[in-house]
């Protein structure tokens, strides 16, 4: 049944465009658009990840296929959000520009929010971003974490979640 509902939503996206209902695409960065740096997803060593998370190392991460889909979505006029649990870095927008990743808004982990879980943080940030549209939007959320996907699916109306 869930697949049928998703197919109906996909077919209705063209109809949404004719009514000027915004289509929002929200993407995680690590493991979704680009290969993650370091081994955090395997060893959950946050201090090691912070040490590995340098501008130089990020320049050489391998692009994943969804990055090209993001570019196509932006060309179609969709609203693009990048939502990452990475600690705030001044150079992250520059990195996205160098990697040719267009976006409308970015959310990184604020330094003061280090202790909140990733799935709760992403849900809060996404709610903040979509709240300006009220109930008039179509949201696609892309993430490689089942926990993040479940949190968004259960906590945000009108979200179509894509686990990659």
Can you describe what each PLM-predicted range is?
Residues 2-119:
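Alpha-helical substrate-recognition element adjacent to the catalytic core
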Residues 136-164:
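Acidic, Mg2+-coordinating phosphoryl-transfer loop and its flanking beta/alpha structural elements
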Residues 23, 122-146:
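Conserved Lys-Pro-Asp/Glu-containing loop-to-beta segment of HAD-superfamily phosphomonoesterases
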Residues 68-69, 125, 151:
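Alpha-helical elements of Rossmann-like donor-binding domains used by nucleotide-donor carbohydrate transfer enzymes
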Residues 95-102, 131, 152-160:
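Short, surface-exposed basic-aromatic patches at helix termini and helix-loop junctions that form
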Residues 70-74, 130, 153:
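Surface-exposed amphipathic alpha-helices with a cationic face
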């Amino acid at each position: 049944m869930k697949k049928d509902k998703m197919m109906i939503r996909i077919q209705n996206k063209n109809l949404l465009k004719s009514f000027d209902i915004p289509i929002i695409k929200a993407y995680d960065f690590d493991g979704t658009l680009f290969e993650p740096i370091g081994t955090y997803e395997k060893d959950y060593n946050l201090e090691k990840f912070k040490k590995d998370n340098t501008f130089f190392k990020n320049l050489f991460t391998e692009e994943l296929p969804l990055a090209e889909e993001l570019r196509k979505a932006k060309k179609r006029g969709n609203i693009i959000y990048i939502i990452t649990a990475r600690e705030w870095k001044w150079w992250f927008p520059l990195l996205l520009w160098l990697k040719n990743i267009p976006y409308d808004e970015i959310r990184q982990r604020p330094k003061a929010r280090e202790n909140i879980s990733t799935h709760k943080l992403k849900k809060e940030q996404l709610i903040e971003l979509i709240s300006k549209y009220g109930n008039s939007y179509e949201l696609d959320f892309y993430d490689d974490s089942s926990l993040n996907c479940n949190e968004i699916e259960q906590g945000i109306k009108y979200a179509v979640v894509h686990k990659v």
